[in-house]
Amino acid sequence: MGKFEGKIALVTGGTSGIGLATAQKFVNEGAYVYITGRRQNELDKAVNQIGKNVTGVQGDISKLEDLDKLYDIIKQEKGKLDILFANAGIGNFLPLGEITEEQVDRTFDINVKGTIFTVQKALSLFPDKVGSIIVTGSTAGSIGNPAFSVYGASKAALRALVRNWILDLKGTEIRVNVVSPGGILTPAYDELFGDALEEVLENSRNTVPAGKVGTPEEVANAVSFLASDESSYLTGVELFVDGGLAQV
């Protein structure tokens, strides 16, 4: 029997990379999983790849009506939620002198506002106020990166929110933690760096203490730990999955 047998999980941003790997991990461990994504074709491909015990729901977490639709579906079909992996997010490079209002609004709409209401609207679905919430942060929220300040600020905001949420949730058994990846080989990572990817990978081999970038599966393992009873006395922590990058 898997450690998530009988559990219902939601993974936002579950169509590729870390989200997809985590959804697959949850299913492999016995959970029924809902995944979200903004593009139906990518959602369909992810559902087919996972293969069983999964439902895809199209939506944009920055739109509250999409979140309401999502949670209505989960409530009607399963009646509860045990695990929430609030993973959906975006990021792009723009140096200070080129930051636009559109970039700031879009990044904070999805990464911050979207995550706030993803978590808030899930609370009523946790049975007997018991469950685990994991929020995707980033090493960019803790260390500086050229041209990445807006994204970094949005992830630092999530870290601050979680510190406060654990106080708001005192008296329940709902735990909230942050998983903060460093460089992880995902489709989004490829898209972010484009032609500079090989240079980035070589730089990582020289600067990351582990000597490499990570894989989505390595992050999924950390999320699985935080979602499980194995981490029952952990709440409010930030677990870095970064090969030691943020520690030096």
From Swiss-Prot:
EC number(s): the record gives 1.-.-.-
What organism is recorded for this protein?
Answer: Bacillus subtilis (strain 168)
Family as reported in the entry's similarity comment: Belongs to the short-chain dehydrogenases/reductases (SDR) family.
Write down what this protein is called. Answer: Uncharacterized oxidoreductase YkvO
Q: Under which main EC class is this enzyme filed?
A: oxidoreductase
**Which lineage is the organism of this entry classified under, starting from the top rank?**
Bacteria, Bacillati, Bacillota, Bacilli, Bacillales
Q: Please give the SMART domains that the UniProt record associates with this protein.
A: PKS_KR
Q: Which UniProt keywords apply?
A: Oxidoreductase
Q: Which Gene3D superfamilies match?
A: NAD(P)-binding Rossmann-like Domain
**Primary gene name:** ykvO
Gene Ontology MF term list: oxidoreductase activity, acting on NAD(P)H, oxygen as acceptor
Check the record and name the Pfam families matching this protein: adh_short_C2 (PF13561)
Q: Which residues form the signal peptide?
A: none
Q: Enumerate the active-site residues.
A: 151
- Positions with a binding annotation for NADP(+): 12-19
**Binding residue positions for substrate:** 138
Q: Does the keyword Oxidoreductase apply?
A: yes
> InterPro entries, from UniProt?
NAD(P)-bd_dom_sf, SDR_fam
